């Protein structure tokens, strides 16, 4: 290779392509975890490189900035272009520090979509490399490509997104036809949080009277729901319960178009996914799409915005059922009784209670839907006694060592975190240690720092130890925990959840309790 011919050199162009091929593997993992939403790879790259908590990555970002400036200012100079390319190659392959290729908790799955996105990223890079070669800018633009490999992947996401949507069309059409053929009552559930728990409660309470199918796990998007129907909906199924999630306006409307739910519910409106929507009013507008054509709408009217929506829909002639976790005057309500159990009422008539830790409003919505499905009150009352929490949502177990473990690792939100801390206080023995292991909460937009600081304050009051995992919300949690005072005596920091769990195993004993509040995949810092 001639070092003097850096402007018009196939080897230099190939270097850029090969390095992008390597670096893109870790960014593909990020894209997959973020549901292939265009723009999110660059967003996460920015977080990794410009986090206040990582001076190493910020320093690398500064070096890359100099390499970029050098590459575009003097692309024909081998004395400048070659060192700039070398810096870009090393940084692209080995940084950001902490973001691995394999991943500990969020490994890359080489699905068809992942392969298409990866190949598209390389194809775009190859085309740009050819153009760079023809423009006599091989080494200079190769440096730019390796530095901006996250941007190239996001560009590929934009390009392939329409094709991916069309690729799903046959599966969606098949699912819609199968729903029409089997013709179950269709229930749609959405909300900022509480969707999966509410779906789980409905399935349990209705199963004694009806043959039901609930969409598995968090299969709550177009592809997931189509797969759930195509693979699991059997002839004779009387009820299909579909959890419906959204990352942008119009997504739920596209689900409603083919699922055609008869009964729908909105569990809550809150700051979860606020960074994607921009405001809670925008979240409400996206969530209310679920009620477009439904004959029955169940709403958690403890939320003032949903109470207003209930009045609006009722004026339109809809059948609206108001559910509450505080007000027994509502059609369905769930409140704490003197024993601390969740007591369920229908038109102020007692149905039964459960000792299972639940978000009261979620259970109220679930009972309201189950009643609308025609399940008798006495069957619901009996089912409440054996109600189980959804996986990783306030599951409580006691280990052989006598440690109470509260697992609330799935999809933490401000309301759920408060409930989880109450459970920690309720289950800890007198004098026992109360430990919270948490990375904090994410996707809260402009409220993220304040909400995590508030969580830190609450932990400071309820716990004796806080184990902060990772860097994402470290500053906010630390500030809140120190401000909270209360029982808190120890602040611990761990780079990974595995290390925090190991500390818990080595240090806690009989009478102690630990709450695992949220668990972020490792593409978060």
Predicted feature locations:
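Transmembrane-cytosolic junction motif
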Residues: 30, 153-182
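ATP-dependent carboxylate-amine ligase
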Residues: 1-137, 143-162, 371-378, 382-392, ...
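Short beta-strand segments
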Residues: 188-190, 243, 267, 300, ...
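Walker A (P-loop) phosphate-binding motif
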Residues: 174-218
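Short catalytic-loop micro-motif centered on adjacent basic/acidic residues
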Residues: 188, 213-215, 239-243, 297-299, ...
């Amino acid at each position: 290779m001639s070092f003097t011919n850096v402007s018009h050199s196939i080897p230099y162009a190939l270097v850029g392509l090969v390095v992008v091929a390597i670096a893109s593997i870790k960014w593909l993992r990020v894209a997959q975890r973020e549901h292939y939403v265009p723009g999110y790879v660059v967003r996460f790259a920015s977080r990794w490189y410009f986090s206040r908590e990582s001076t190493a990555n910020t320093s690398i970002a500064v070096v890359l900035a100099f390499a970029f400036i050098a590459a575009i200012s003097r692309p024909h100079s081998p004395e400048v272009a070659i060192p700039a390319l070398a810096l870009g190659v090393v940084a692209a392959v080995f940084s950001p520090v902490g973001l691995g290729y394999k991943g500990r908790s969020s490994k890359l799955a080489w699905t068809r979509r992942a392969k298409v996105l990866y190949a598209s990223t390389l194809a775009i890079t190859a085309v740009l490399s050819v153009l760079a070669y023809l423009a006599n800018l091989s080494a200079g633009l190769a440096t730019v490509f390796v530095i901006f490999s996250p941007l190239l992947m996001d560009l590929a996401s934009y390009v392939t997104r329409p094709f991916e949507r069309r690729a799903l069309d046959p599966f969606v059409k098949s699912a819609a036809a199968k729903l029409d053929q089997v013709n179950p009552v269709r229930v749609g559930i959405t909300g900022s949080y509480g969707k999966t728990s509410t779906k789980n409660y409905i399935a349990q309470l209705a199963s004694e009277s009806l043959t039901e199918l609930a969409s598995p796990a968090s299969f709550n998007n177009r592809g997931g729901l189509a797969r759930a129907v195509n693979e699991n909906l059997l002839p004779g199924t009387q009820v299909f319960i579909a959890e419906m999630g959204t990352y942008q306006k119009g997504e739920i409307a596209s689900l409603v178009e083919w699922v055609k739910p008869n009964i729908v519910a909105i569990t809550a409106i809150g700051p979860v996914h606020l960074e994607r929507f921009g405001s809670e009013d925008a979240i409400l507008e996206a969530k209310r799409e679920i009620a477009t054509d439904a004959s029955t709408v169940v709403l958690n009217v403890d939320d003032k915005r949903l109470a207003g929506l209930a009045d609006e829909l009722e004026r339109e002639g809809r059948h609206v059922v108001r559910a509450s976790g505080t007000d027994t005057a509502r059609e369905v309500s769930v409140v704490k009784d003197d024993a601390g159990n969740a007591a369920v009422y229908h038109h102020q008539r007692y149905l039964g209670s459960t000792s299972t830790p639940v978000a009261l409003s979620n259970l109220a919505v679930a009972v309201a839907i189950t009643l609308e499905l025609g399940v008798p009150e006495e069957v619901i009352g009996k089912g409440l006694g054996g109600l189980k929490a959804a996986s990783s949502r306030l599951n409580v177990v006691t280990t052989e060592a006598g440690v109470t473990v509260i697992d609330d690792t799935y999809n933490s939100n401000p309301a759920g975190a408060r409930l989880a801390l109450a459970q920690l206080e309720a289950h800890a023995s007198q004098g026992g240690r109360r430990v919270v292991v948490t990375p904090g909460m994410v996707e809260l937009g402009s409220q993220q720092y304040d909400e995590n600081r508030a969580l830190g304050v609450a932990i400071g009051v309820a716990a004796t130890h806080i184990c902060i995992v990772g860097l994402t919300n470290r500053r906010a949690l630390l500030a809140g925990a120190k401000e909270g005072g209360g029982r808190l005596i120890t602040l611990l920091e761990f780079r990974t959840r595995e290390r925090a769990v190991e500390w818990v195993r080595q240090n806690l004993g009989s009478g102690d309790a630990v709450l695992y509040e949220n668990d972020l995949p490792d593409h978060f810092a």
